[in-house]
């Protein structure tokens, strides 16, 4: 296999800047890998070869002219989850209702990537409107896990994770509403980070649940993820939920972690996120990771988060409620698909026909649940109570951080499950987000870093590291130190 596509992003960037490799060569190598393998994995919904090569050529011209490059990742190609708007590519969000739709504007994340000189290879597959845990809810067919094509790559951002694992791209962008970056990262042995809520702009990120959604970086190493995090983070006046605070030095933290130990770092193990219901191999991998953190000098203790028990129920009331509001905009008048527009139907009938044909079953399910939870007779009993539980979960984590610096848990309760195994059992699918969604409810930051392969089935397992809001640098210090001590893992292909 081409050594270019197996290189990490930091190495590629250094070689491009040193004129040892051109960005066009690196981008073409990734495009060739996509062409050779994506029929098998279906990680991409749209490939933008000409646009990517054009952006790469601009970087090469700057290198040749001796100009200062716009970012430490200039020239390194990237895969973008199809939930971020792009003027030069379709944005479908994995849904038929947006089939062929092109946005009139770029998302802020897209704009920052372009300004950083990062060629965008294309848009990756995802569960429809980011609702799902397996990428099986995409209207355009499921993505397959490169570790085992009969298994799911996780979701909703399985396309971005699979693209990394299949060496189709060295970098990727995802979005995380209840674990959609971290969970696929765990199932594909890649690194995924959910930044602190509000630190990466949501402008142009098509909303699923506005108080939970957060864009974030994905890569194959902690340092690469940090370099990408630094590119996309920062305050944005176009996003009313954007936090006007300095971006932590995540790159410096990653470098320090990789070069040092964890002496003095206090690590908490969440009592509620281990034990019954977890696959034995996942627990074994997690316990080994905790032992490794201890060997690095970390002070490990158990922390109690009693309201995590109610996180799943609260999440699956809050999220559908926001979904039912956000997806009301897809009314057959302004976007994409339109059914029954032949003059024989009223506007209401056109809307009903279009939404019935354009939305998949999981999206319809969540719209109905959310509409019910927000209805006059049930608002206080369901939605209001869920928001109170959300506050208690955030307080649990705040209390934990009084005695520890980071909290750790398995990233998922099991390894990747089989394609079709849970698609007809929504509750089983929802339970798969058990480890990741409390963090979204609290608005804090989290990372999944590979912790090896399960002895049960030889499939990847992820270690989840969590930190308080605006302490994203702690994730990178601990994650990089653990990654260096763990050593290299074999790849999927």
From Swiss-Prot:
SUPFAM superfamilies: Amidase signature (AS) enzymes
Protein name: Glutamyl-tRNA(Gln) amidotransferase subunit A
GO biological process: translation
ATP-binding as UniProt keyword: yes
Pfam family for this entry, one: Amidase
Catalysed reaction, written as an equation: L-glutamyl-tRNA(Gln) + L-glutamine + ATP + H2O = L-glutaminyl-tRNA(Gln) + L-glutamate + ADP + phosphate + H(+)
Taxonomic path: Bacteria, Bacillati, Actinomycetota, Actinomycetes, Mycobacteriales
Catalytic residues (positions): 81 (charge relay system), 156 (charge relay system), 180 (acyl-ester intermediate)
